[in-house]
């Protein structure tokens, strides 16, 4: 099995976990292909070159599975690099809170053994696509978690005129608007009081950021809707953020957000559910009084 390993910079205390991961992959006789930037980091920072491994850069088409080693941010960057290649991704958590990277360091060995036995499931995660006649969004105009429209600085609010399937919804006067997928419902959207959706829900969430009116609340819409946004700003510009990748945009252009025509494939263990993740990561039901 050809396994790609993608990662990000980390502290030295994570090195034993990383070494254990590569040792297990070698014990399972996998063909290991390490993301070039991650390989360079391990070599330069820790003088560590994993045995029996090759380097992969832009061409990932020959990989069977990709391991994302880090946190949810690393997982999102990995999804960008996988693009439309339809390669399943397994998130291994060496960061902090991880909804996408939910395999803990103490679960790596047993999870990899399950992986090589084919004992796992794949969840198809919806992506958002943003388009504009005048902007290419860095060549990758998709987001797995959310697309956020935000004011550029600490100045006054922006106004976001919003249409659903060409029918006027409202004009948000706010610091911004977060359009989130079910996957992104536990990310930025949740921090601005958006609801949590199950990964299999076929919906998007529109959550205003610090709206001028307290009556303006998040709304859940079907994911086959096309969202059209037109922004007004006193600074004549605003920010568009795709999973944290931000770009300045001028006012006067029309943005369209819709469901992408492909999905990100996420590997999950059979014995672990989304409800367990919610309990563990959000500490639902925990009593800390003692």
Where are these regions (language model features)?
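ATP/NTP phosphate-donor binding region
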Residues: 1-65, 106-121, 132-141
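Short glycine/serine/threonine-rich phosphate/pyrophosphate-binding segments
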Residues: 14-15, 73-78, 186-191
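Gly/Ser-rich helix-loop-strand patches that form or flank binding pockets
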Residues: 77, 82-94, 99
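Catalytic core of DAGKc-family lipid kinases
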Residues: 96-175
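ATP/nucleoside-binding phosphotransfer catalytic cores, i.e., glycine-rich phosphate-binding loops
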Residues: 149, 154, 165-168, 214-290
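Short aromatic-centered micro-motifs
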Residues: 162, 184, 240
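Gly/Ser/Thr-rich active-site loops/lids in small-molecule metabolic enzymes
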Residues: 170-174, 179-215
């Amino acid at each position: 099995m050809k396994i790609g390993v993608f990662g990000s910079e980390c502290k030295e205390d994570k090195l034993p976990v990383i070494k254990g991961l590569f040792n297990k992959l070698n014990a399972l006789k996998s063909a290991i292909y390490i993301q070039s930037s991650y390989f360079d980091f391990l070599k330069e920072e820790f003088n560590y070159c994993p045995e029996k491994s090759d380097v992969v850069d832009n061409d990932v088409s020959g990989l069977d599975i990709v391991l994302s080693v880090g946190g949810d941010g690393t997982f999102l960057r990995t999804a960008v690099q996988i693009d439309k290649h339809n390669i399943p991704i397994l998130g291994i958590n060496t960061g902090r809170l991880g909804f996408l990277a939910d395999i803990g360091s103490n679960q790596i060995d047993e999870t990899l053994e399950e992986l090589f036995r084919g004992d796992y499931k794949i969840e198809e995660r919806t992506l958002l696509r943003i388009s504009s006649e005048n902007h290419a969004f860095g060549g990758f105009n998709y987001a797995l978690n959310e697309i956020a429209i935000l004011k550029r600085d600490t100045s006054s609010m922006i106004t976001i005129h919003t249409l659903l399937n060409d029918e006027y919804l409202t004009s948000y006067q706010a610091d911004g608007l977060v359009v989130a997928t079910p996957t992104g419902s536990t990310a930025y959207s949740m921090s601005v009081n958006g609801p949590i959706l199950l990964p299999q829900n076929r919906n998007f969430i529109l959550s205003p950021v610090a709206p001028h009116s307290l009556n303006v609340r998040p709304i859940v819409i079907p994911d086959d809707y096309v969202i059209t946004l037109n922004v007004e700003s006193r600074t004549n510009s605003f920010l568009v953020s795709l999973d944290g990748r931000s770009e300045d945009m001028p006012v006067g252009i029309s943005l369209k957000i819709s469901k992408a025509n492909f999905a990100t494939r996420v590997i999950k263990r059979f014995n672990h559910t989304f409800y367990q993740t919610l309990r563990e990561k959000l500490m639902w039901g925990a009593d800390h009084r003692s």
